[in-house]
């Protein structure tokens, strides 16, 4: 068999340089010397007969060839990690690692409950939770870096033939108001009342905002006419802003359980409008599925439904 033109260690070095932007920082992150990093890069460039890095500027940037190699290198390294986890499963079915992905709201307010149930049943299995945008989570599932994910948005179009999407539960969305707002005296408001509110909104690219806009549009309510007081990228920041009487907001009902119990926020229903989004389980059927992932899916997800949140008052 001919010698391979590069090693796994060399791929890790190239990945570190791309992430850190310099040979020295890459060396520090890998706990090896800078000359060792330089030598490994020179060796792989010599073996492949291509230049992988542009060393002309202050930052070490990948060339087109470097980007191409790293794209395949990420897949190779992910497959190696997958292999190790499969062997770990084979050695002992009661141990291992479960890597879960979730979009922002789901990861913050739902996943801790699910992970707690799983850890009580399987304390030997280590759980890693990755919280990111729906798009990034789906790509990590596709690449084998995440075992199983729960998302509240749609899978990217380019991944729909690769990933398996299973409906899981409904996530009700709530219109929240400061308790001092005149509308807080009502359990239900009219559609026209929305145009009188000042809104604290999630960024336009957020899943919840897209879902709310689409549902409202179906009821002939046009969010483009809303007065947006400010945009924030954090549900916690939005809740704080609403409590500070800066405006109203749409959030997941799962995020306001404590605030409703303590009377810190008011949940106003909109007449004849139901605000729900679908939560889905995302897996990659073409990747190895660990025993830990099977247990989480079959024993935890199958038996647990997110608790229903009710407006107080």
Swiss-Prot record:
Ranges for domain HTH lysR-type: 6-63
Localization (cell): Plastid, Chloroplast
InterPro entries the record matches: LysR_subst-bd (IPR005119), Tscrpt_reg_HTH_LysR (IPR000847), WH-like_DNA-bd_sf (IPR036388), WH_DNA-bd_sf (IPR036390)
Keywords tagged on the record: Chloroplast, DNA-binding, Plastid, Transcription, Transcription regulation
GO molecular function ontology, one term from the record: DNA-binding transcription factor activity
GO cellular component, one term: chloroplast
DNA-binding region of this protein: 23-42
Pfam families, A to Z: HTH_1, LysR_substrate
Main location: plastid
Gene3D superfamilies tied to this protein: 3.40.190.290, Winged helix-like DNA-binding domain superfamily/Winged helix DNA-binding domain
Family, as annotated: Belongs to the LysR transcriptional regulatory family.
PANTHER family named in the record: HTH-TYPE TRANSCRIPTIONAL REGULATOR, HTH-TYPE TRANSCRIPTIONAL REGULATOR CYSL
Function noted in UniProt: Trans-acting transcriptional regulator of RuBisCO genes (rbcL and rbcS) expression.
Name this protein carries in UniProt: Probable RuBisCO transcriptional regulator
Phylogenetic lineage: Eukaryota, Viridiplantae, Streptophyta, Chlorokybophyceae, Chlorokybales
């Amino acid at each position: 068999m001919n010698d391979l033109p590069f090693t796994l260690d060399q791929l890790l070095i190239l990945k570190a340089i791309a992430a850190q932007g310099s040979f020295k920082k890459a060396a520090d992150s890998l706990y090896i010397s800078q000359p060792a990093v330089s030598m490994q890069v020179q060796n792989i460039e010599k073996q492949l007969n291509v230049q992988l890095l542009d060393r002309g500027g202050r930052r070490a940037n990948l060339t087109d060839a470097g980007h191409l190699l790293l794209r395949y290198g990420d897949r190779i390294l992910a497959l190696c990690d997958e292999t190790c986890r499969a062997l770990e499963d084979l050695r002992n079915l009661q141990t291992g690692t479960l890597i879960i992905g979730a979009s922002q709201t789901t990861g913050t307010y739902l996943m801790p409950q699910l992970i707690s149930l799983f850890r009580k049943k399987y304390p030997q299995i280590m759980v890693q939770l990755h919280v990111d945008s729906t798009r990034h989570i789906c790509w990590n599932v596709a690449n084998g870096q995440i075992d199983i994910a729960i998302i509240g948005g749609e899978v990217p179009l380019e991944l729909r033939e690769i990933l398996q999407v299973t409906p899981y539960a409904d996530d009700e969305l709530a219109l929240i108001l400061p308790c001092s707002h005149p509308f807080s005296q009502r359990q239900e408001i009219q559609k026209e009342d929305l145009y009188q509110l000042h809104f604290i909104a999630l960024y336009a690219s957020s899943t919840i905002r897209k879902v709310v806009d689409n549902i409202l549009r179906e009821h002939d309510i046009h969010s483009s006419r809303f007065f947006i007081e400010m945009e924030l990228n954090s549900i916690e920041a939005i809740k704080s802003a609403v409590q500070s009487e800066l405006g109203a907001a749409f959030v997941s009902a799962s995020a306001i359980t404590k605030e409703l119990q303590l009377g810190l926020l008011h949940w106003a229903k909109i007449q004849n409008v139901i605000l729900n989004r679908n939560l889905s389980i995302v897996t990659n059927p073409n990747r190895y599925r660990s025993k830990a992932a099977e247990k989480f899916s079959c024993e935890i997800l199958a038996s647990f439904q997110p608790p229903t949140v009710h407006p107080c008052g």
